[in-house]
Every structure is written in C-alpha cells, then in structure tokens.
C-alpha cells in the first residue's frame, strides 16, 4: 500500500533558507570585523593556564589587570614590529614602576619576579634596573610566568599599539 504524501510547495522553504543565510552572513561579518582568535603556541607560555583567547578589536579601553593584545614595536631581532603579543596590563599612566633583578613593582605592589630571560638575552640583569613614571598613553604589561618576555625587558607600550581586550577561552 502506498502512502500518499501531499506535495509541499518549495517557495516557503526557499524564502526561509534565504533569510537564514542572510542572518548568518550578517552575524558572521560582524564577528569577523570585531573579533580575532589568538593562539599561544609557545612551549613556555607567559599566561600558563590558557592557550586560546578571544580578542575584541573594538574594546581597547585599558583596564588594569585586564588581558590585552598589542603590536610589538622595537623588539627586533626577537620579534618583528607588528607581531601580536598578549599580556596582562599591570601599569597605567601615572603609575610608578621600579624594576630590579629581584622583582618589578608597580606602585609598590609586586607584578613580576626575577629576570629569568636576561641571560638568554645576553644582558646583565642589572642592565634592566630602572625606576620610571608611566606617561600619558603608556602602559606596563606583564606575563604571569617568570620567563615571560614583557615590559620589564622592553619598557612601556603606547596606547596606539593596543589591538584589543582579550578573553581567555581555554
């Protein structure tokens, strides 16, 4: 015995499919304009608990202790200018920074310890020692690992280098 099926018109399905495709295209375009995925492939990560980050290109407003992606500048030969880096913002304009071989203090609070990379860089630990006040549009970035290549080695990052706020995914 044959079951009779009523033939359904294809036009309503085509309209729904077109609307769905347009919505997906708009949402996809918005996401591609606003967000990037950052993946830390280093063996020794400066932020040890996370490998993948969502970077919000439209959120560049600096907030202390936030994670930010920024473009490197003047770090050759280790990194080409424009290399995207990701660190924790630990110093804002007006903050007092003191760097010694033992630790880095921002307004008297320790944000990093030691100079684990000084020997690899071929520079004496004491060469990085300094005290400074962060100027307008200058930000201090730190990694959480002792081996993080961060502001203690290369100084402050300018506001225009900041790419966007980063959120850890996994």
Positions of predicted regions on the chain:
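PP2C/PPM family metal-dependent serine/threonine protein phosphatase catalytic domain
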Residues: 107-126
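Mid-length scaffold segments of soluble, non-membrane domains
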Residues: 80-111
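Short, exposed beta-strand/loop patches in secreted or surface proteins that constitute
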Residues: 44-45, 89, 96-97, 131-132
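Extracellular/periplasmic metallocenter environments
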Residues: 128-129, 134-156
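Protein maturation boundaries and topogenic segments
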Residues: 1-84, 133, 152-170
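Solvent-exposed loop/turn segments at secondary-structure junctions
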Residues: 60, 97, 104, 147-148
């Amino acid at each position: 015995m044959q079951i009779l099926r009523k033939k359904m018109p294809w036009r309503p399905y085509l309209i729904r499919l077109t609307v769905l495709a347009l919505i997906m295209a708009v949402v996809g375009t918005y996401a591609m304009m606003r967000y990037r995925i950052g993946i830390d492939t280093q063996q020794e990560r400066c932020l040890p608990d996370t490998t993948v980050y969502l970077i919000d290109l439209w959120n560049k407003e600096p907030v202390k202790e936030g994670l930010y992606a920024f473009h490197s500048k003047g770090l050759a030969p280790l990194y080409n200018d424009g290399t995207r880096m990701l660190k924790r913002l630990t110093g804002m304009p007006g903050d007092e920074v003191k760097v010694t071989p033992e630790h880095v203090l921002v307004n008297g609070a320790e944000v990093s310890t030691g100079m684990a990379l000084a020997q690899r860089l071929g520079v004496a630990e004491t060469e990085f020692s300094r005290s400074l006040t962060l100027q307008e549009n200058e930000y201090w970035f730190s990694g959480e690992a002792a081996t993080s290549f961060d502001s203690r080695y290369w100084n402050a990052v300018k506001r225009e280098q900041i790419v966007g706020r980063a959120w850890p995914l996994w």
